[in-house]
């Protein structure tokens, strides 16, 4: 995978952490990891250094609150200052469902919190990254194949298979992830003329700390996932990161506005 530029990853656990480590292993020259908790981001940056393959690899950490515009712009400005440019950006910030209820009993406060982080946060991050990348010099996607054009950057949002199907008792999550798909599509359309690609990965159940906690709280959840997924197992965060690496790389130079479902076949037969 030809990933020789610099990366900016939001999210220091689960999918975000897996993406950061994958970028380091695939040879990026530098990375900035952002998280609400600076200590968590710093720990991932240190781990990236231990796995990096670029001889002059650089890894830094920065705090970010995706719900606050000033925080997002400051974090992105810091990453740009440290790295010189941002070639690959991944937004993995998000919150899961705390109260699962049918629509008649659904929590308005949780709905609003879900949208503040998962939707408004995605919008602010995508907006800020788009503005920054527009100022960057275009670089050839593949010098050996000029027809692939030039790039000012790639953005990958972490969505969900819930952006395509509904799940009983989870209207807040379903609605929020449908919105992420919409933001990704519109951003891709607006940014195409600037040489900026915008895509998303949309997994179903992934083995992350958030899902493991849910499985601890709901003992039958593991068995339910196993039965619901045609491939018969939960996804690894590393498998989602593999898809992000592809979408970030020159191999996906013609992919923009793509919302890649990674669900082991779940949405083929049922809800998530």
From Swiss-Prot:
Q: Specify whether rRNA-binding is a keyword of the entry.
A: no
Read off the CDD domains from this record.
SDR_c (cd05233)
Organism for this UniProt entry:
Neurospora crassa (strain ATCC 24698 / 74-OR23-1A / CBS 708.71 / DSM 1257 / FGSC 987)
Keyword presence, S-adenosyl-L-methionine: no
| Residues annotated as the enzyme's active site | 173 (proton donor), 177 (lowers pka of active site tyr)
PANTHER family, alphabetized: DEHYDROGENASES, SHORT CHAIN (PTHR24321), SHORT-CHAIN DEHYDROGENASE_REDUCTASE FAMILY, PUTATIVE (AFU_ORTHOLOGUE AFUA_5G14340)-RELATED (PTHR24321:SF12)
Q: Which GO terms describe its molecular function?
A: oxidoreductase activity
State the source organism's domain of life. Eukaryota
Name of the protein described by the UniProt record: Short-chain dehydrogenase srdC
Copy out the induction comment. Expression is up-regulated during sexual development. Expression is also up-regulated during confrontation with the arthropod fungivore Drosophila melanogaster.
Residues that bind NADP(+), according to the entry? Answer: 15, 65, 127, 173, 177, 206, 208
Enzyme Commission number(s) of this protein: 1.1.1.-
Recorded hits in SUPFAM superfamilies, A to Z, give: NAD(P)-binding Rossmann-fold domains
Top EC group: oxidoreductase
The protein's matches in InterPro entries, at most eight in alphabetical order, are given as: NAD(P)-bd_dom_sf, Sc_DH/Rdtase_CS, SDR_fam
One Pfam short name: adh_short_C2
Physiological role: Short-chain dehydrogenase; part of the gene cluster that mediates the biosynthesis of sordarial, a salicylic aldehyde structurally related to the phytotoxin pyriculol. The most interesting aspect of this pathway is formation of an aromatic product from the highly reducing polyketide synthase srdA. SrdA synthesizes a reduced polyketide chain from one molecule of acetyl-CoA and five molecules of malonyl-CoA. The polyketide chain is then reductively released as an aldehyde.
Lineage of the species this protein comes from:
Eukaryota, Fungi, Dikarya, Ascomycota, Pezizomycotina
Task: State the family it belongs to.
Answer: Belongs to the short-chain dehydrogenases/reductases (SDR) family.
Q: Give the keywords, sorted.
A: NADP, Oxidoreductase
């Amino acid at each position: 995978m030809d990933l020789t530029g610099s990366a900016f990853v939001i999210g220091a656990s689960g999918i975000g952490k897996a993406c950061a480590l994958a970028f380091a292993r695939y040879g990026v020259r530098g990375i900035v990891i952002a998280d609400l908790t600076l200590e968590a981001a710093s720990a991932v940056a240190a781990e990236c250094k231990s796995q990096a393959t670029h001889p002059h690899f650089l890894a830094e950490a920065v705090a970010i609150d995706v719900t606050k515009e000033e925080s997002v712009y400051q974090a992105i400005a810091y990453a740009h200052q440290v790295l010189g440019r941002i070639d690959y950006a991944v937004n993995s910030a998000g919150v899961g469902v705390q109260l699962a209820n049918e629509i008649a009993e659904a929590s308005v406060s949780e709905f609003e919190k879900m949208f503040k982080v998962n939707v408004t946060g995605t919008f602010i991050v995508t907006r800020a990254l788009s503005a920054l990348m527009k100022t960057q010099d275009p670089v050839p996607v593949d010098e050996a194949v000029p027809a692939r054009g030039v790039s000012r950057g790639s953005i990958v949002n972490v969505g969900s298979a819930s952006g395509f199907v509904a799940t009983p008792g989870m209207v807040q999550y379903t609605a929020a992830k449908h919105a992420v798909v919409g933001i990704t599509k519109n951003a891709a359309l607006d940014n195409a003329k600037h040489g900026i690609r915008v895509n998303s990965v949309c997994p179903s159940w992934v083995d992350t700390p958030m899902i493991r906690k849910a499985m601890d709280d709901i003992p039958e959840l593991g068995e339910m996932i196993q039965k619901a997924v045609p491939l018969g197992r939960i996804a690894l965060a590393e498998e989602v990161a593999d898809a992000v690496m592809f979408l970030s790389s020159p191999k996906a130079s013609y992919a923009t506005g793509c919302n890649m479902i990674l669900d082991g076949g779940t949405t083929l037969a049922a809800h998530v």
